[in-house]
Amino acid sequence: MDRFSFFFAFYGLILGLAVTELLGGFAGMVRAHALKKLEAQTALLALLIFVLICATWVDAFDMSKGITLDFGDLWAPILLATFYYLAAAVVFPRDEAQYAHLHAYFAARRKFVVGMLIAAEAVDHAANISWYFDQHAHHPAHFWGWIIPYNIAIDGCFLALFFARGRRANIALLSALILLFLVPYWHQGVIDGLVMRLFGY
């Protein structure tokens, strides 16, 4: 087993457990015949976390060339996976009696879940800071034309979601975040390639 496979076995386990929490929570509602009570905010939050986990899984392959088995390289992905697991574990209630009050359940736990997602984004930014400097130095147009606006949009939506109070605002922000993460990962490299060609690289 090579170094990346050894790392990915542990990393994938944590991410897999996070997916299990999401699917298990949804399956619990199906078993309790409570699917009609599934609130839009909860459904979108679960979908967002699922998309984030899938995107993180895709990103893991970009790390395969230079991964080393030490805390210097592993702290970021392990923290990232841990934050996603904690967020996923809280999305759906474990008590069937709470299915009838999903709106209240969402409101009571929204800041914790979104806080975990913001923490994951902060870890991702910190881990990629050298890459940001490299892009700024060698591809400034791409850096200012895509990387910065894209990340500002994501971070802005997360912060707005953390402080949002209305149901409509929550739904709009969750939908926007899902689209923001789906677009560049739908076909890896397509958006980056378009931006690079736009700026003449």
Language-model segments: residues:
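Central hydrophobic cores of alpha-helical transmembrane segments
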Residues: 44, 170-182
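A generic, lipid-embedded transmembrane alpha helix
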Residues: 40-63
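Membrane-proximal helix-loop-helix units in multi-pass membrane proteins
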Residues: 81-150
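Hydrophobic transmembrane alpha-helical segments in integral membrane proteins
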Residues: 1-18
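Juxtamembrane boundary at the C-terminal end of a transmembrane helix
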Residues: 133, 183-201
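Membrane-interface helix-boundary motifs at transmembrane edges
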Residues: 28-41, 64-69, 97-107, 160-173
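Alpha-helical transmembrane segments of polytopic membrane proteins
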Residues: 8, 12, 71-82, 141-154
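Alpha-helical transmembrane-segment detector that highlights a single hydrophobic TM helix
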Residues: 61-89
